[in-house]
Amino acid sequence: MNESVARVFDRILRGLGLKTLNAQFLLSYALMFGLAACASVALYLSMSISPETINVAGAQRMLSQKMAREALQLRLGAGDPKALAATIAQYERSAADLDAGNAERNVSRMGAPEIAAQRQKVAQIWGRYRAMLDQVAQPASQVDLRGFSQYSTELLGELNNLVSLMSARADSVQHTQMWIAFGCLLAILVLVVLGRQFGLAPLMRQLRGLEVALTEVGAANFTHALAAGHADNEIGRIVAGYERMRQDVSGLLANVKRSAAETDKDVAEALEQALGAGDQVARQHQDLDQVATAMNEMSATVAEVARHANHAAHSTRDAAALAHEGRRLVEHASSQTGALAEELEQTALALNTLHQHAGSVGQVLTVISSIAEQTNLLALNAAIEAARAGEAGRGFAVVADEVRSLANRTQQSTQEIQGLIEQLQDGANDAVAAMRGSASHAQSNLVEADSAAQALGRIVATVEELDGLNQQIATAAEEQSQVAQDIDRNITNVSGLSEQAHEGTAAVLSANQRVKEHMAGLRVVLGRFRT
């Protein structure tokens, strides 16, 4: 019921163009102020007829009787003419004050038609009565005392009527003004009650609804929607502002929750990939350890080849010296040639072993290159995932770039080692061919030992050629030994870089784990908000 009446009043006020609460309350205040002013004016007008006016009219009755008494006393010779004259003058002044009003005596003029007619009637009677007073006051004059008494009685009666009319008029005016003031005060009370019941009460209900909504917001509940009755008043604008704030914050929290869920998913994927990268780096580190061990063995083998090459060089020089001694030492030369053939065979076997080890190293380097490429791809994927994660993945992106850089350097070093191994294989192939040629010559020397004297010149030339070849073999072996040492150092460096990559991967795993814990805390905090 109250809501219906409140809506009716609201429609009426809005129909008058008073759409805002400020304008509506201003109208009610203006009405109450106008009614209060009207009540004040009515109360003032109720006091406009002074009681002194009624007193003056009543005093005229006593003055009329006093004048009659004083006139009769003068007629009997006992009165004072001055006293009668003073009484007459006082009566006439009172009559003039009643006719025109006298502010000094606080006498107001009552201009009601019936009162004016009664004053006119009293004035006519007073005119006749005044003439008879003068006659009665003279002892020697002939006066109709009965007529004088009748005029005195008539004047007194009309004065009584005048006083009654004036009193009734004063009471009527006073009652009318009092009723007007009472009506204004009653209207003010009605406005206050209506404003409280149908203005303030709906306003307070809306404010209480807003208070409940804001309390829900304070409790992290953004699902409580508000609907404004009118969007063009103060409460409507406040509710509209609250709704915009609620929807914006609710949308923001929903986006944050969605972003947190996606970030948590990305972090989980990055953590899984980092675990896989860590396993790859660990396997790469193991493979590099195996390569380093193989390179150490190859270095030892190359050193052995160098020693054999030097020994072969010494042998050929000895053979050349013995060849110059002559035929007498042919048999000894034959035995030396057999020994030389055996050494050459061993050298060929050693070079074959070197060639095989070089091939093994090439295979290991191929594995290293493949691992480096996989590491590079994993680092690139990690960098892409970190870029997707935004600010939360920046640290992981830095680590991923470092891992990718290490993988690139490992791949470059592996390619360089591969080139050196290929050179080593080419040199080993040449050496094997040379050794096989030398072995063939040695076998020929053994077969042709009987013709050593005739072929002594050719033997000397052959031995000199063997000496040159052995010098080349020794030089190549020394170079291969140096290359093997360089490869060993590079492999050691690669192993160190792999260790750093392994540590970096562990750091990335730790960072991802911390990010995952932070995201879990963020989910707990966001879970408090209902959107």
Swiss-Prot record:
CDD domains: MCP_signal. Residues 52-140 are annotated as: PilJ-type. One of its GO terms (biological process) is chemotaxis. Keywords: Cell inner membrane, Cell membrane, Chemotaxis, Membrane, Methylation, Transducer, Transmembrane, Transmembrane helix. It holds the Pfam family MCPsignal. Residues 259-495 form the Methyl-accepting transducer domain. Residues 1-24, 196-531 are cytoplasmic. Residues 46-174 are periplasmic. Nitrate binds at residue 61. Disruption phenotype: Mutant does not show nitrate chemotaxis. The chain crosses the membrane at residues 25-45, 175-195. Its main location: membrane. GO terms for cellular component: plasma membrane. It is a multi-pass membrane protein. A motif (N-box) lies at residues 54-65. It is found in: Cell inner membrane. Residues 201-254 form the HAMP domain. Induction: Expression is repressed in the presence of nitrate. A single nitrate molecule is bound to a site on the dimer symmetry axis. Ligand free ligand-binding domain (LBD) is present in a monomer-dimer equilibrium. Nitrate binding to the periplasmic LBD stabilizes the homodimer. Chemotactic-signal transducers respond to changes in the concentration of attractants and repellents in the environment, transduce a signal from the outside to the inside of the cell, and facilitate sensory adaptation through the variation of the level of methylation. McpN is a chemoreceptor that recognizes specifically nitrate and mediates chemoattraction. Binds nitrate specifically and shows no affinity for other ligands such as nitrite. McpN-mediated taxis occurs only under nitrate starvation conditions. Belongs to the methyl-accepting chemotaxis (MCP) protein family. This is Methyl-accepting chemotaxis protein McpN. It comes from Pseudomonas aeruginosa (strain ATCC 15692 / DSM 22644 / CIP 104116 / JCM 14847 / LMG 12228 / 1C / PRS 101 / PAO1). The lineage of its organism: Bacteria, Pseudomonadati, Pseudomonadota, Gammaproteobacteria, Pseudomonadales. The gene is mcpN.
